[in-house]
Amino acid sequence: DIVLKLFYGVFEKENVITRAARLENHGETAIELEKMLSFSMDLMYENYEMIYFSGRHAMERTAERIPVQHAKVEIGSTRGTSSHHYNPAVILCEEGAGETHGSCIGACLVYSGNFVAAAQKDQKNQTRFQMGIHPTNFCFHLEKGEAFDTPQAILSYSGTGLTKLSQQYHEIIREHICRGAYKHAKRPILINNWEATYFNFNEEKILKIAEQAQKLGIEMLVLDDGWFGKREDCLLYTSDAADEARSVD
């Protein structure tokens, strides 16, 4: 009555396999789905390390590295967003692997919500590696005939270190996820006034920045926070375009 389908995509050029799963309710009653991951992988090698990425403003995607042992190693986010605070991408590499040597397996979710990634040795020192939507606060109601699809996971392997793995992810994301006119073109250059002025700006200051930027070949100026209403510091409210512009015409 319940059917699980596994979906694999093979991108030979990029050395990537994608994996997702679908659960279909063909029964007569509704079900509550409380946990469903994008992949679960069993590995024979004994001594893995997990590399994951956390961070904050001005210190984005800081790599941290910990050994995988019999106690479960688990990272994730339940904030509803991922971004550079806790990135939904992890690497499982052999002990001591570096940029140009050692085997490593990457896993990246095409999803920016709550996620979990876990690895653990079993009693025979084999490693189970899993990743998907975080089960905390997750409950999906499936009526008869309905289905649930997990986010897609992008899996890649390198036998020659982390640099090759990174390059393979660059390629798959550039070729198959990035969209728009600038997918394979140089992007226009823009300048943002925020770090130069913060909230303290007027028309004269903005025009001076624009004039200097134009001389350098910069093609666009982005007017940042503070152009609307009475927002003169970070403690005041944010607003929208309906507010009267306070500093520039």
Across the structure, where does each feature detected by a protein language model lie?
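Short, basic/aromatic beta-hairpin or loop at an interaction surface
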Residues: 119-129
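Terminal connector regions
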Residues: 162-176
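Conserved, mostly hydrophobic/aromatic
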Residues: 21, 145, 191
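Short Pro-Gly-centered flexible turn/kink motifs
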Residues: 140-159
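Single conserved hydrophobic/aromatic residue that forms the stacking wall/gate
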Residues: 237-249
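Aromatic-lined carbohydrate-binding/catalytic grooves of carbohydrate-active enzymes
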Residues: 184-239
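Polysaccharide-binding surfaces and accessory modules of carbohydrate-active proteins
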Residues: 1-120, 136
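Short acidic, Pro/Gly- and aromatic-enriched capping/linker segments at domain boundaries
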Residues: 127-141
